[in-house]
Amino acid sequence: RLSLVGSEMCIRDRFKDYDYIVAPSASCAAYVKVYYPKILEGKHECISSKKIMDVVEFLHDVLKVDHVPGKFPHVVSVHNSCHGVRELGLSSPSERHIKPFNKIIDLLNMVEGITIHEPERKDECCGFGGMFSIEEPAVSTRMGEDKIKRHMATGAEYVTGPDSSCLMHMAGIAKKEKMPIKFIHVVQILAAGL
């Protein structure tokens, strides 16, 4: 059995020589960035939490990408995940009265041929929430169904976002319910045509 302290030390040692740790999932990046320091408080400094970031955050804030060579001639609806919005700052949360921004949309706007929409209640949870979906499967599924319907109401062919867990949750529900919409990670769109 590996303790959390031992686990973190493995991660710290593995990534100590890197400037950044880039994660393809906002919820995973948020866990290491926000929760590792709290879990490990008083045991040792969590070096990984200072280096990790979501791929959208890395492309937008560090690399400052200003051109994407790919093409994606489809209509998409952007899924703003809870962790991405509220813990990583990938977009402005609706409950705060600040100037609206969305790093996901900033990047997608560089893709040739794409049409971008956001659903009504754009930053409301899809119902996954990790253990929540296991402990409250009926509520989780209903929240996912409602979120998918709002994405579909935009006329989108695809739902996209930076959080793999949200996309997998909604894709599973859509498949089971035979809902005519597809799911694709934002990086797949940014890399389309490469």
PLM region spans:
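Glycine/small-residue-rich loop that forms an oxyanion/phosphate-binding "nest" at active or ligand-binding sites
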Residues: 24-51
